[in-house]
Structures are given as C-alpha cells and as structure tokens.
A protein has these predicted regions:
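C-terminal cap/substrate-recognition subdomain and adjoining C-terminal extension
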Residues: 2-13, 103-237
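Alpha-helical substrate-recognition element adjacent to the catalytic core
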Residues: 1-21, 25-151, 155
Length: 237
C-alpha cells in the first residue's frame, strides 16, 4: 500500500471524529517540502461557518433534513456524488434571484477574510459547492483560482440542478490541484473538512483538516507556513 493510500485510510477514520469534535489536525507527507508554494481551501464548512445547501433548503422549510443529509455525506456515511445529486434535487425550482440572495447572505469570518487577502502565495478555493457560490466568495476576497460544480437554470430562470458532467467530487479536487500546481503537490497546503476532501488531503504534501467551528484557521495556516505546527497536532475548540 502506498503512502497516499495509507494517508487516505487514516483520514477516512479521522474525519468523522474531527467533524464531531470540531477539531483540526495537520498531516504532512514524507514527501512534503519545507517550503510551501501553493495554498488551497475547501469552501463550505471550511471557510464558511454556514453551509449553502441547508440555507437554500430553509426557503422550503427543509433545512433540518438537508443538514442531516449534508453531514452524512461529509462524514463519509453516504457517497458524495449520489448524495449531492439527491440534495440538489430538493432545491430544484428555486429562482435564480433566491439562490443568489442566499449566496450573498453567507459571510466569511473576519480572520478568514483577512487570511485569504494577506496570503502572498498562489491561493485557490477548491470545492464541490455550486460554482455561483464559489465565484461570489472569490470576488469578495480577490481570488481568481477556483473550481466548483456547474449548475443549470431553465429558460425562465429556475434552478434546474447540476450539470452531471461538471460535478467536482473528491477525484475532481485532486485533479484540479494537480493541474493548478503543475504537479507540485508535495509543496501544496490543502485545507478541507469532509469526505469529499479525502483525495486532495491524501495527495498533497501538507494536509490540514479543519472545520470552521474550530475558529482559528488563520493562526493554524500561518503556523504551518512558518513550520511551527507539529504533525498530527490535534486542537479543539
């Protein structure tokens, strides 16, 4: 079994615990370079404390159902792609205006916004979240590198679900990082909080598991960039 496969297996067991306890832990690979050249983040639940889909489901009174389905997928209890398509079907028919209104209502923690704006390294948001959400967040913080799942609208502007050919799943995240960094995964720091981040976290040299409820992303990232955070250093809030 390769080191990447071993890291993926370890993360598979650690992620449900980390989500339950709102913990953060750092897992560098043996191939990790001392100097980090690229930094990337998941979006929902990592950069934002609020998840988009439960907020959209609130418009139809199904927020609790959506929250439970989302948590099951992020903890790895249900397959991500299957769950994402099902959860998206619950939102079909929302107006474009309603979707964008909810997107604009979701804020980033102040320290997270500061972190994204102050990083001097190439920085990207790598997420399976809806592309309009990712684009909106990137515009707010001045980032141009991102990937998200494309969505469709009907001719009269109603939300019509996902483009099945453009869903960003765990493999899609890893593939984006490979291309964006020109293969420099050993010198890349990736931060994520769910099962959809497994492939990316296992592939990069510097993996940080972090849930937004932990509340110290800026401090942890700067510790890693300055080589001050020990491997598998679990912190809880």
């Amino acid at each position: 079994m390769s080191e990447t496969e071993l890291r993926r297996e370890l993360l598979t067991h650690l992620i449900p615990w980390g989500r339950t306890t709102h913990s953060a832990f750092y897992l560098p690979a043996s191939s990790a370079t001392a100097e980090i050249t690229h930094v990337a983040f998941d979006l929902d639940g990592t950069l934002t404390t609020t998840e988009l889909l439960p907020e959209l489901a609130r418009l139809s009174g199904r927020s609790e159902e959506m929250t439970a389905l989302t948590e099951a997928a992020m903890a790895g209890a249900t397959p991500f792609r299957e769950s994402f398509i099902h959860r998206t079907e619950l939102l079909r028919g929302l107006s474009r205006e309603a979707l964008h209104s909810v997107i604009r209502s979701i804020t980033l923690p102040t320290d997270t916004t500061l972190l994204l704006r102050e990083l001097s390294l190439p920085t990207a948001i790598v997420t399976g979240a809806y592309q309009p959400f990712v684009e909106d967040i990137c515009e707010r913080v001045g980032l141009s590198a991102f990937v998200g799942s494309a969505v469709r609208y009907t001719a009269d502007g109603k939300f019509d679900g996902l483009d099945p050919e453009a869903i960003i799943d765990a493999e899609g995240k890893r593939a984006f990082l490979e291309e964006w960094t020109a293969g420099a995964l050993a010198s890349t720091l990736y931060t994520g909080d769910g099962a959809n981040d497994l492939d990316a976290l296992a592939a990069v040299g510097h993996a940080l598991f972090y849930t937004a409820q932990h509340g110290d992303l800026r401090g942890l990232v700067h510790q890693i960039l300055s080589a001050d955070l020990p491997p598998l250093f679990p912190t809880t809030r």
